[in-house]
Amino acid sequence: MTNLRKTHPLMKIINQSFIDLPAPSNISAWWNFGSLLGICLIIQILTGFFLAMHYTSDTLTAFTSVAHICRDVNYGWLLRNLHANGASMFFMCLFLHVGRGIYYGSYLYKETWNIGVILLLTVMGTAFVGYVLPWGQMSFWGATVITNLLSAIPYIGTTLAEWIWGGFAVDKATLTRFFAFHFILPFIIMALAIVHLLFLHETGSNNPSGINPDSDKIPFHPYYTIKDALGAVLLLLVLLPLALFSPDSLGDPENFSPANPLVTPPHIKPEWYFLFAYAILRSIPNKLGGVLALLASILILMIVPHLHLSKQRTSMFRPFSQTLFWILTADLITLTWIGGQPVEQPFIIIGQLASMLYFLLILVFMPLAGLFENYMLKPKW
């Protein structure tokens, strides 16, 4: 009798994706983040679903409904803390996943990579509209500042901003539609993640060496199911202490005050995972220029595959490219720090230099390093 998992129409898909999938034998822990992102998404959808049962998307009651969840709902405090800190874990895994893709040349699977960039943008959008929902001071002013950037678009900007707001400013209509967006987007993310996997399984996984691994494959189960399970345990070992012992350490104290359109916080800033892009936005004195730089900081990932000029796929055997990659990492950490600082010297000039270096590294230095390494590979005698 033929095994059911190999013949049943639904089981067959699961089998080919997670059980009998041929995987390279040498993929390292850096390949764990895909499954960790899947776990993060499931945690976010489940906790968000239960939070949505008790949340009210009205300007008068949104803030108090969140307080009610934390005080009166059974384990409401845990749901909220897991959801808020789960977002931080989600972005941490996302950044490491993208970093792995850049370091090991995974971006050469162009369809998988481009869907991944769209996923990154969608997750960022979801996190932004979600941050507005508690209707604290930073929620309100963050929404005001970021949506106001739309008005920088020539001709249609103001109309577009008012269309998003549902009025002449961020108000009840804005909050209601942001809640609707925040509810629907995770399911769109889930669909995109399936497409992401679909394209990945067309080519198979890349590996640290960048060499075609077809001659040395092992089944996904039990080897990588066990490895992914270990990754999941480690993820929870970070998330649970964070959510249970220090749930507010990554948030802004300003958000403990209800939204007040008449009082501006001394320093408006987004959550830590947006600070690098926020620093790039602020580094350009012109409003439209800042918006374009903000978009370019993420969309630049789309052209990374076309800037790959090296004959080798990964950075594993390319010391110059490795050095530039770690400079880029340090630069992004610097931008994250700058994004959280007030707009004054020396932070302004540091932010401008770090922003310029970010674009130069990706557009100029990394492709040149690839060409230089190609030249170094040629025999000189």
UniProtKB/Swiss-Prot annotation:
Location in the cell reads: Mitochondrion inner membrane
An example molecular function term from Gene Ontology annotations: metal ion binding
- Give GO terms for biological process: mitochondrial electron transport, ubiquinol to cytochrome c
Residues given in the record as a ubiquinone binding sites: 201
Pfam families, per database record: Cytochrom_B_C, Cytochrome_B
UniProt keyword annotations, A-Z: Electron transport, Heme, Iron, Membrane, Metal-binding, Mitochondrion, Mitochondrion inner membrane, Respiratory chain, Transmembrane, Transmembrane helix, Transport, Ubiquinone
Q: Would you say which domain of life the source belongs to?
A: Eukaryota
Q: What else is known?
A: Heme 1 (or BL or b562) is low-potential and absorbs at about 562 nm, and heme 2 (or BH or b566) is high-potential and absorbs at about 566 nm.
| Function of the protein | Component of the ubiquinol-cytochrome c reductase complex (complex III or cytochrome b-c1 complex) that is part of the mitochondrial respiratory chain. The b-c1 complex mediates electron transfer from ubiquinol to cytochrome c. Contributes to the generation of a proton gradient across the mitochondrial membrane that is then used for ATP synthesis.
Family per record? Belongs to the cytochrome b family.
* Listed name of the protein: Cytochrome b
